[in-house]
Amino acid sequence: MSTYYFVIVGQNDNPIYEKEFSTVNKELRKEDHRHLTQFIAHAALDLVDEHKWKTANMQLKSIDRFNQWFVSAFITASQIRFIIVHDNKNDEGIKNFFNEMYDTYIKNSMNAFYRINTPIKSPMFEKKSEIFGRKYLLS
């Protein structure tokens, strides 16, 4: 069983997009589980900002840990932060997922009808995140 909570955080610490990937059956999942992962991701924002100055890499592996949850992050050149809260180690899968989602985010950002730093509501973006989540995180 593995669970991943993915969130894209804007420049003003506002959530732009969020998605949960899980192999756990929906009936077995607890409702407060979602609030916990959101809280962990929000609490890790300061650590992400701290770590981004210490490395030239865009990807930050396991920057924080809370009980059984790990936090991994990816920072774009425009200071948009991709954060994954996960309960098992999968560094290679997370790296590939971040790279694919970054590419998808760039394509979405180039859309003339999308304003940077606003919530992403594109059905294609949602579909691609679902595909990449199943491919890299849940396989």
UniProtKB/Swiss-Prot annotation:
Keywords: Cytoplasm, Endoplasmic reticulum, ER-Golgi transport, Golgi apparatus, Transport
GO cellular component, one term: TRAPP complex
Entries under InterPro entries matching the protein: Longin-like_dom_sf (IPR011012), Sedlin (IPR006722)
GO process terms (BP): endoplasmic reticulum to Golgi vesicle-mediated transport; Golgi vesicle transport; spermatogenesis
Main location: cytoplasm
Compartment annotation: Cytoplasm, Perinuclear region; Endoplasmic reticulum; Golgi apparatus
Lineage: superkingdom: Eukaryota
Role according to the record: May play a role in vesicular transport from endoplasmic reticulum to Golgi. Involved in dsRNA uptake.
Subunit structure as annotated in this protein's UniProt entry: Part of the multisubunit TRAPP (transport protein particle) complex.
Family: Belongs to the TRAPP small subunits family. Sedlin subfamily.
PANTHER family, per database record: TRAFFICKING PROTEIN PARTICLE COMPLEX SUBUNIT 2
Protein name from the UniProt record: Probable trafficking protein particle complex subunit 2
UniProt gene name: Trs20
